[in-house]
Regions:
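Conserved acidic residues
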Residues: 108
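A conserved beta-strand element that flanks and buttresses the S-adenosyl-L-methionine
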Residues: 111
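Short catalytic micro-motifs in class I SAM-dependent methyltransferases
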Residues: 114-118
Length: 208
């Protein structure tokens, strides 16, 4: 088991999902960005680092029918499956490190709230982008949220990389066109504020 996996398994085994700093009662921004992507309800969507997030509950209730969740922590996924009950059987679950993920098919939307900013190693970021390119349909869209350049420098005790639009565009490289970007304030369960930046890109490269 990698050190990264050990860290996240420990987090989800020792904290309730609604006590972690990134918990949202309703992921309003994510839902809005996905809606603005204007993909059909049967288009495949993957929530990268989704863990125990309730985003999938809302997507299910809004009649999206092809939902996948990827997370390195099996404990996090178990929380989500338990919460969803029988609905969980209608979703696709993947326990894997995103930098090593082998997409079973291509997706219309790739959603990542606060995974990419944990990749402090350049090689890991390059691997992530390679997986992203393999995973997206032509003209598919990627939604990434990270701490902003004036936001926190750590999350869950780990160092992170802060981003703005120029920096994120440079990381993704050729084949991605920025559609929109902005900022958001997240309020943690303990009442702290965290400054996020969000980015929505369209994949402009042809599928290989």
């Amino acid at each position: 088991m990698s050190e990264t996996k050990k860290h996240w398994e420990n987090v989800y085994r020792n904290k309730s999902p609604d006590k972690v700093s990134w918990y949202q009662q309703k992921p309003a921004l994510s839902l809005s960005l996905i809606a603005r992507a204007r993909t059909p309800r049967d288009a495949p969507i993957i929530d990268v680092g989704g863990g125990s997030s309730i985003l999938v509950d809302y997507l299910y209730d809004e009649a999206y029918t092809d939902i996948s969740v990827l997370d390195i922590s099996g404990s996090a996924l178990a929380h989500a499956k338990t919460r969803l009950g029988n609905k969980a059987d209608e979703l696709h679950w993947y326990e894997a490190d995103v930098t090593c993920f082998k997409p079973p098919h291509r997706y219309a939307i790739w959603h990542d709230r606060a995974v990419f900013h944990f990749l402090t190693n350049k090689l890991d970021r390059e691997r992530y982008v390679n997986v992203l390119k393999e995973a997206l349909e032509p003209c598919g869209q990627v939604i990434i949220m990270t701490f902003a350049v004036d936001g926190p420098r750590k999350c869950s005790g780990l160092d992170i990389v802060q981003y703005d639009a120029d920096k994120m565009t440079a990381e993704l490289g050729e084949g991605f066109s920025l559609v929109e970007t902005g900022h958001d304030i997240h309020h943690t369960p303990t009442g702290n504020q965290q400054k996020f930046a969000y980015f929505r890109f369209r994949f402009t490269a042809e599928a290989g």
